Amino acid sequence: MDFGLKGKTAVVSGSTAGIGFAIAAALAAEGARVIVNGRTEARVATALQNLRQLVKDADVRGVSADLGTAQGVAAFLQQIPETDILVNNLGIFEIKPFLEIPDSDWLRFFEVNVLSGVRLSRHYLPGMLKKNWGRVIFISSESAQQIPTEMIHYGMTKTAQVAVARGLAQSVAGTGVTVNSILAGPTASEGAGVFVESMAKQQGVTKAEIEKQFFSTARPSSLLKRFETTEEVAAVAAFIASAQATAINGSAVRAEGGVVQSIF
């Protein structure tokens, strides 16, 4: 299937590693011109090098900017004033009991996980509407529906992303622009890898045993019974960004390995 992305420009926030990097690679493989973003020039340069090795003739460019701040977004937009596809992937997470989460953490999580996408979408949507074609995708999580008690502030931001995506989709109804969110499940990203390795060392067991333990206790409802790969999530994002996915609009697309115990 031809995704129809040749000649399209795609911005992927927070794309030097993990799900964001995998999405950048998937879009580049489909012929899109991909803008890679990270906070430091070093990480961006490494990501570009890896992408060019992974995807033959990849058309990629990097822009270092902290999109978790208004100033960082403004600097980024000066260099990349328009795009056809926007993937709001930037996000942070942290395990912390509710009673220990200060106001500053709530505000920081909201600004990075939610406002980064709001600011980018607010800028890029008018250009998409003018061309009558565009794709906006928010990378959310199953935590949007099943708020994790060990990081309620993170879950709050994932729910907010779904709400923003649905509202934006309704605001551009009847146009060639679609806005969706993807609810990813527990994924073998850089952060998850650090967590698993740390727990394995603490308990003196293998990483495979920690993964099995995680899915038997923390996410027992998972049908996949393992961490998703970043490429599995990226494949969903690439299709939603495609010209073939016009009928998918305003949706919270579940790609969470069956963790959410609901048929709808």
Residues covered by each model-derived region:
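Conserved glycine-rich cofactor-binding loop
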Residues: 9, 16-17
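Catalytic Tyr-X3-Lys loop
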Residues: 84, 92, 99-118, 133, ...
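Active-site loop immediately N-terminal to the catalytic Tyr-X3-Lys motif
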Residues: 99, 148-152, 174-175, 225, ...
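Active-site helix of classical SDR
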Residues: 121, 157, 165
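Alpha-helical segment proximal to the catalytic Tyr-Lys
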Residues: 126, 170-171, 246
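Residue(s) in the substrate-gating loop at a strand-loop-helix junction
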Residues: 141
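Short C-terminal tail/terminal secondary-structure segment
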Residues: 146, 237-238, 249-264
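Short, small/polar-rich loop/turn modules that mediate ligand/substrate recognition or access, typified
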Residues: 173, 178, 248-250
